[in-house]
Regions:
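Conserved alpha/beta catalytic core and glycan-binding cleft of carbohydrate-active enzymes
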Residues: 134-135, 139-299, 309, 358, ...
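Non-transmembrane alpha-helical segments in soluble domains
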Residues: 36, 105-109, 134, 245-248, ...
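C-terminal membrane-anchoring or membrane-association module
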Residues: 466-481
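Substrate-binding/active-site clefts of carbohydrate-active enzymes
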Residues: 1-112, 125-141, 145
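Active-site rim elements
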Residues: 92, 118-121, 234-235, 260-273, ...
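Conserved, mostly hydrophobic/aromatic
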Residues: 11, 39, 108, 119, ...
Length: 481
């Protein structure tokens, strides 16, 4: 039966069913290496989704046959602890399990030239193990990426104070955490399909969105009580924005399109499209690491299947006709990515820089979040960049930080580095369900195409998540190791 592969049996061998001949062990190894090499030659870094937190078998697993009970945590009555929800959880806090994990990731990094690791249910691992993994990978290549889910599936035998939870990110420098704060703030809870978020009508989630915009770092303009009341964190958890993996959707739970349909079953397709654009316009203009679910740029649907781990290709495949049908959404996402790459102001990481150079605009209508990036933030060519997210169903007149000739590069229909229009003055009318980006950049020639900026821009981190595979684009990385 098809399964994403979250039932590990042998951690150090590629899955054979993806090879041309699964019955010959060397074929899967050779072809996996060839795949990684080809991706590197195309300028694409490869991140593995690793599931060290549990095994497919429990009592009969290889680990349990070596030393019964040692590699798994137990409950007080002697049973197997099940913080993974899959029947068991491995004991990373025991020295030989920790050693196995370190040996395994360093093997993948050196033998297969893997560029990063995404840890499933990372909070089932202890803080010390995660820090040792980060240290071992840094010795191999400091640019290797490590991030994961800063939560578990409930009921772990590991002491909470020892677990690699999101709230303890400050104790794990160099390790990123998925931000469910901005995820559910934007679109609503993943555990309640009908619950909306900011873009689909729950405007009281605006503070949670703002918290995500500063990359979960401390900022004087964030009301953390309101963040918590909206179901988010009770305080900042990231010491730098690079620790915050900002996303709206991934392979788990509903696709963004399906979530929007579930919350607004009577909405017309054009309104859903606007929300689909705005959701990731928030992500791609926020501080932190943007993460996009593969297919979100073409309105991917799984027909409402929120847990498709064992569903067929009919559900999980990408239908490339979606791209033709939703070319406008695709181009919009592409333009936002170009904008982010061209402007380092969107890529600050230090908390102090974000505090000093990102100012939220106040006295604005409910349902609108707006901020200004100022002081040529992070060495940007633009002295000011103003971002406005209007999630309401009506036009909103928004005052700009100053009276100037503002270059509009993003509105509800178009996004990119080219100037759409020059807005003269100190206010702008923002259309419903739309995100706008305006800037003051003397280096921009408003009569020419600005795609050439991509040639000189620093690379931004962008994660494209498929079902269980992750690809990272980074122009600074060499084509292959």
């Amino acid at each position: 039966q098809f399964n994403w592969g979250y039932d590990p049996e042998n951690y150090n061998v590629p899955e054979g069913s993806y090879s041309t001949n699964p019955y010959l062990g060397d074929v899967r190894i050779r072809e996996f290496k060839e795949m990684v090499k080809a991706l590197h030659e195309a300028g694409i870094r490869v991140v593995m989704d690793v599931v060290y937190n549990h095994t497919g078998a429990t009592a009969d697993s290889d680990f349990n046959k070596i030393v019964p009970g040692y590699y798994y945590r137990q409950t007080t009555d002697g049973g197997f602890s099940n913080g993974s929800g899959c029947g068991n959880e491995t004991a990373s806090d025991r020295s030989m399990m920790r050693k196995f994990m370190i040996d395994s990731v360093t093997y993948w990094a050196t033998e297969y030239n893997i560029d990063g690791f995404r840890f499933d249910l990372m909070a089932l691992h202890d803080i010390d193990t995660m820090n040792e993994i980060r240290g071992a990978l840094t010795e191999i290549d400091p640019t290797i990426i490590t991030y994961g889910e800063g939560w578990d599936a409930g009921g772990s035998a590991l002491k909470p104070t020892e677990a690699a939870l999101k709230i303890y990110a400050s104790q794990m420098p160099g390790i990123g955490m998925f931000s469910d704060d901005i995820r559910d703030g934007i679109k609503g809870s993943v555990f309640n399909a009908e619950e909306p978020g900011f873009v689909n009508g729950q405007f009281t989630f605006d503070e949670r969105v703002k918290f995500g915009i500063v990359g979960a770092t401390e900022h004087s303009q964030i009301d953390y009580n309101r963040v918590a009341l909206a179901g988010g964190a009770s305080g900042p958890w990231a010491t730098e924005a690079a620790q915050s993996i900002n996303y709206v959707s991934a392979h788990d739970n509903n696709t963004l399109y399906d979530k929007l349909i579930a919350t607004l079953p009577d909405a017309d397709e054009e309104t859903i499209k606007l929300m689909q654009k705005q959701a990731n316009a928030i992500i791609l203009t926020a501080q932190g690491v943007p993460f996009l679910h593969a297919g979100v740029e073409m309105m991917r649907t799984k027909d409402g299947d929120h847990n498709s781990y064992n569903a067929s290709d009919e559900v999980n495949q990408i239908n490339w006709n979606w791209k033709n049908e939703n070319q406008d959404v695709y181009n919009y996402y592409k333009g936002l990515i170009s904008l982010r790459r061209a402007h380092p102001a969107f890529r600050m990481s230090a908390q102090e820089d974000i505090q000093n150079n990102l100012t939220f605009m106040e006295d604005i209508p409910l349902g609108v979040v707006a901020f200004n990036l100022e002081n040529n933030a992070n060495g940007d060519s633009a002295s000011d960049i103003t971002v406005i997210h209007n999630a309401t169903d009506s036009e909103q007149v928004i005052s700009l930080p100053k009276s100037a000739d503002w270059q509009l590069v993003v509105n509800g229909e178009t996004a990119g580095t080219e100037v759409i229009e020059v807005i003269k003055g100190d206010s702008i009318t923002v259309t419903p369900h739309s995100s706008y980006v305006l800037m003051i950049d003397d280096s921009m020639n408003t009569t020419e195409n600005f795609n050439q900026l991509l040639l000189i821009a620093g690379a931004a981190l962008l994660v494209i998540a498929g079902t269980a595979g992750y690809i990272i684009y980074d122009k600074k990385k060499k084509a292959s190791k």
